């Protein structure tokens, strides 16, 4: 009996000791878990911030250098290379990059119904329309520099916001807020102000041909963008790289037709890459990577990042053009680019809120 009482007392002491220590241990475990979650959250936040910063910087540099590289690729005021072959090279490179991305997806996830390349005629038949629109728009961007300089091009390029917004309303039946309509008016005013030339007999620096080409490019870009978005949203589960692949395939085909129509003799006699320089190669890489950067913005960042990149790119293009091409920064250009930046920002934040 005495022995049993001693054992019971020892068991009670052990249990009591556990009861005394448990709250502290639980508190310590809880503190450790909270600390781990906080550290993980902070690390995730830092990684997200770094990724957004890298994507923003990349998109800004690519956007601002597009017009500069096109102008810089000229020799004695004209293109020594064939612009149709350059366009074809851009589409081919984007197609290759899409295949590389798909290959990585197949290795990690396997081939599924949504990421396989084989498809139906009905699905593929919708891609020729945006492909040919993008081809014409991309060709026009080479010829518009006969009438505008690089900074003016960056300003006028924002006209596609207006065409995209109006076509969104007409084709996709999306409503535009009052702020967005006001942003359109500001955008037109900013583009016009930036082109004012008080020191010349001509009111605007850009001739009528440049404005017409800029408006046509904006319409083509807007319609192609809205049409492409409608295609993508028709089957949202479809891998974006598969959709891009087929779009770029048709882009290559149409650019091949353009080569045969416009530059067939020159390509056959002088070669496909005749007149290419290091700047030309950089320009092709820039155009291909710009599309990837925009996709990364949509996936890893948000639309406001694209807005900031566009605004900074306009000013950065102007500053670089001062040193490379002797561009003169005027008060009208500075005020106009500021108004354009504000209008782009208002268009982004003025999106109608979804009804609950």
Swiss-Prot record:
Question: Which keywords describe this protein according to UniProt?
Answer: Golgi apparatus, Membrane, Sugar transport, Transmembrane, Transmembrane helix, Transport
Composition bias (Basic and acidic residues) maps to 1-24
- Residues exposed to the Lumenal side: 74-82, 147-149, 197-211, 261-277, 336-356
Show the Pfam families listed in the entry: Nuc_sug_transp (PF04142)
Q: What is the membrane topology here? A: Multi-pass membrane protein
The answer on whether this UniProt entry bears the keyword Aminoacyl-tRNA synthetase reads no
Q: Does the keyword Membrane apply?
A: yes
Q: Where in the cell is it found?
A: Golgi apparatus membrane
Q: Where is the composition biased (Low complexity)?
A: 27-43
Which GO molecular function, any one, fits this protein according to its record?
pyrimidine nucleotide-sugar transmembrane transporter activity
The record's region (Disordered) falls at: 1-43
An example GO CC term for this entry is:
Golgi membrane
Q: Which residues lie on this side of the membrane: Cytoplasmic?
A: 1-52, 104-125, 173-175, 233-239, 299-314
Could you list the residue ranges that cross the membrane?
53-73, 83-103, 126-146, 150-172, 176-196, 212-232, 240-260, 278-298, 315-335
InterPro entries, alphabetized: Nuc_sug_transpt (IPR007271)
Q: What functional role does this protein have?
A: Sugar transporter involved in the transport of CMP-sialic acid from the cytoplasm into the Golgi. May transport important nucleotide sugars such as CMP-Kdo (2-keto-3-deoxy-D-manno-octulosonic acid) in physiological conditions.
Family note: Belongs to the nucleotide-sugar transporter family. CMP-Sialate:CMP antiporter (TC 2.A.7.12) subfamily.
Q: What is this protein called?
A: CMP-sialic acid transporter 2
What lineage, starting at the top, does this entry show? Eukaryota, Viridiplantae, Streptophyta, Embryophyta, Tracheophyta
- UniProt lists the gene as CSTLP2
């Amino acid at each position: 009996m005495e022995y049993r009482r001693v054992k019971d007392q020892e068991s009670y002491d052990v249990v009591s000791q556990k009861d005394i220590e448990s709250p502290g241990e639980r508190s310590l475990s809880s503190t450790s878990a909270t600390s781990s979650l906080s550290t993980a959250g902070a690390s995730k936040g830092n990684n997200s911030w770094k990724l957004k910063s890298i994507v923003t910087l990349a998109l800004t540099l690519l956007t601002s250098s597009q017009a500069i590289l096109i102008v810089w690729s000229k020799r004695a005021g004209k293109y020594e290379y064939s612009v149709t072959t350059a366009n074809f090279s851009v589409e081919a490179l984007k197609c290759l990059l899409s295949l590389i991305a798909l290959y990585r997806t197949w290795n990690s996830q396997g081939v599924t119904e949504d990421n396989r390349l084989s498809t139906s005629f009905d699905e593929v038949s919708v891609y020729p329309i945006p492909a040919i629109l993008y081809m014409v728009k991309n060709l026009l961007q080479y010829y518009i520099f006969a009438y505008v300089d690089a900074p003016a091009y960056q300003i006028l390029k924002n006209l596609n916001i207006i065409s995209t917004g109006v076509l969104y309303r007409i084709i996709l039946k999306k409503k535009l807020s009052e702020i967005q309509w006001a942003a359109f008016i500001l955008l037109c005013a900013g583009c016009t102000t930036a082109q004012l030339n008080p020191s010349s007999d001509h009111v605007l620096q850009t001739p009528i041909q440049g404005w017409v080409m800029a408006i046509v490019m904006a319409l083509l870009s807007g319609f192609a963008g809205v049409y492409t978005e409608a295609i993508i949203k028709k089957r949202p589960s479809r891998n974006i790289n598969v959709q891009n692949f087929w779009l770029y395939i048709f882009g290559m085909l149409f650019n091949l037709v353009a080569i045969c129509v416009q530059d067939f003799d020159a390509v056959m006699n002088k070669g496909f890459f005749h007149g290419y320089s290091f700047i030309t190669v950089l320009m092709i890489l820039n155009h291909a990577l710009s599309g990837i950067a925009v996709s990364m913005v949509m996936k890893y960042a948000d639309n406001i990042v694209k807005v900031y990149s566009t605004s900074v790119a306009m000013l950065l293009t102007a500053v670089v053009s001062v040193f490379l091409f002797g561009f003169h920064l005027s008060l009208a250009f500075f005020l106009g680019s500021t108004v354009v930046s504000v209008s782009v920002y208002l268009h982004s934040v003025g999106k109608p809120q979804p009804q609950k």
